[in-house]
Amino acid sequence: MSNKMWGGRFSERPDEIMEEINVSIDVDRHLYAQDIAASKAHAAMLATQGIITASDAKNIGKGLDTILSEIGKGGFTFKRALEDIHMNVESRLSELIGPAAGRLHTARSRNDQVATDFRLYVRDVIDETDAALAAFQQALVARALEHAGTVMPGFTHLQTAQPVTFGHHLLAYVEMAARDRGRFQDARKRLNESPLGAAALAGTSFPIDRHATAKALLFDRPMANSLDAVSDRDFVLETLSAASICAVHMSRFAEEIVIWTSPLVGLIRLSDKFTTGSSIMPQKRNPDAAELVRAKTGRVIGALNGLLIVMKGLPLAYQKDMQEDKQGAMEGFAALSLAIRAMTGMVRDLAPDEAKMKAAAGEGYATATDLADWLVRTLKMPFREAHHVTGRIVAKAAEGGVALHELPLKEMQAIEPRITKDVLGVLSVESSVKSRTSFGGTAPKNVASQAKSWAKRLEKERKLG
């Protein structure tokens, strides 16, 4: 027997392999809440337009509420023979209310139905991700305020470059998360149009009101072209793109945590809450949470690439290939959610070794730029000349195995006679960070001000909901 939902044209049942490759309920069951919400909006609109009776619409709504409760409580049996979430819900609705259930699919196709469901799902993902990123920012800002003046090495090429503060470093990720949130919100704006009512691809001859269903589902408007409505997956791609960039940020931070917690570096320590041990080496404390964030974020990027490859060769309109749009995306979104929450936990948990940070900040002649700047300001030396002179002084200090501030003044003067003892005032890591007062710089006052500004902004967002 062929599938009773679409089998009027068929006289043979599908091959077992056909059933196996065609089924999607294992994945799209996660759309049940969105599917039921869209069906309720559709049924109400059909009744308002006089396409079905108010009595049928009422019974459909009650039946759908029952199904929603059954699934939520784990009492619903999903049947693989019914292929997908749409047919599973409709079949159960038929059991509950009888023939009236068959009227629900009037002026609707599974093509616009799944497009609507998935838009609602991705919209929910965006809202949840925004909330998670806000919590991540709040954790970063709190630690940045705490460590606005904690000196640490700033790096380029993973080499000590210039002293910065730990708070300044943390605020860099606040800015990244802000851009991530902006990208998700931009994607949400373009996503928030309703495909419902586009039917299979050409619209419908029934006098439906697509604006009413769009409003009921909190979309801004219905999509203007029925072909585009059922074949578009830009909303998933764009959200996965934003998710991938966000994942890169999480991975970069996770990598830093892995490096900083290494005993060879030892700038920070994670508590037992975010580390694991070894089955053979009793002494080990491994930063597995950070390492797993680094790995899981790759799944987000993989989901984006996978869907791009699925979509790149599809003519209009709906193709069955699009059934493969959900699993990778859902797994990618879940991986990002876990990564953000794990990073938030680690930010709250990590303990910087302030003494070690300060000592490391001065290694590698990190205040050499401060010396060059002093030569420019005090001796009116062109920067390129100052750069050259400083390089010679650094070489002299390295030759003697001493730090810049330990190099005798007379040896500096042997290279540049006009240097005075005042230069020693700019060669400490504390004076270096305090001098970086330009907007966006690492001076502790700047960092504290920026952190307070972010704290106010995030609190305002929280109150506005």
From Swiss-Prot:
Its EC number is 4.3.2.1. The keyword Transmembrane helix does not apply. GO terms for cellular component: cytosol. Keywords: Amino-acid biosynthesis, Arginine biosynthesis, Cytoplasm, Lyase. The keyword Electron transport does not apply. One of its GO terms (biological process) is L-arginine biosynthetic process. Pathway: Amino-acid biosynthesis; L-arginine biosynthesis; L-arginine from L-ornithine and carbamoyl phosphate: step 3/3. It is an enzyme of class 4 (lyase). It comes from Bradyrhizobium diazoefficiens (strain JCM 10833 / BCRC 13528 / IAM 13628 / NBRC 14792 / USDA 110). It catalyses: 2-(N(omega)-L-arginino)succinate = fumarate + L-arginine. Belongs to the lyase 1 family. Argininosuccinate lyase subfamily. Its main location: cytoplasm. This is Argininosuccinate lyase. CDD domains: Argininosuccinate_lyase.
